[in-house]
């Protein structure tokens, strides 16, 4: 049986985040043949193109981790009707430098949970727009706003 590897990002940096709990549940529910690997974002410095010629260790580890997965899943909360800054920072690191976008042609999906009335609907729409620009084929159905 072929094993497919999905790298997942937890958009919240909070240790007890409900999105981290959701990601943990998804890992436990993964069927045989599907391996889930977290791609950590907590230790990334803020992105600047000044680093494009010499990536910091944490940023290079992020790009290396993305190279080892078949697809990406974003498990994200919604902050102020968008994605968390830490997640956007990770996307910026992974998509740079120009011409070395780690998301290009890598399938991705988005899920998230929030105690708010609209869940993570707006954050997911923003993330869809960002990932479309990053040339990542997105799963457009089924959308899940928990």
Region spans (language model):
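Short, flexible coil/linker segments at domain boundaries that flank nucleotide/cofactor-interacting
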Residues: 1-2, 103
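N-terminal beta1-alpha1 ligand-phosphate binding loop
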Residues: 2-32
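Residues at the starts of beta-strands that form the adenosine-phosphate
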Residues: 5, 35, 107
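Secondary-structure boundary/capping motif
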Residues: 15-18, 47, 82-83, 119-120
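Active-site-adjacent alpha-helix of alpha/beta-hydrolase-fold enzymes
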Residues: 25-31, 128-138
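Mobile beta-alpha loop/short-helix "lid" or hinge segments that flank ligand
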Residues: 35-46, 135-146
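N-terminal beta-loop-helix "entrance" segment that forms/cooperates
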Residues: 40-58
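Helix-loop-strand module that forms the ligand-binding subsite of alpha/beta enzymes
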Residues: 54-135
């Amino acid at each position: 049986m072929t094993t497919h590897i999905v790298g997942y990002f937890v958009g919240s940096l909070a240790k007890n985040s409900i999105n981290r709990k959701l990601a943990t549940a998804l890992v436990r529910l993964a069927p045989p043949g599907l391996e889930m690997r977290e791609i950590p974002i907590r230790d990334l410095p803020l992105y600047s193109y000044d680093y494009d010629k010499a990536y910091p260790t944490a940023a290079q580890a992020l790009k290396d981790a993305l190279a080892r997965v078949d697809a990406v899943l974003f498990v994200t909360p919604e902050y102020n009707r968008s994605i968390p800054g830490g997640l956007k920072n990770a996307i910026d690191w992974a998509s740079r430098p120009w011409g070395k976008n780690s998301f290009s042609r890598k399938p991705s999906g988005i899920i998230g949970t929030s105690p708010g009335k609209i869940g993570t609907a707006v954050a997911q729409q923003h993330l869809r727009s960002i990932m479309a620009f990053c040339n990542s084929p997105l799963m457009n159905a089924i959308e899940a706003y928990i």
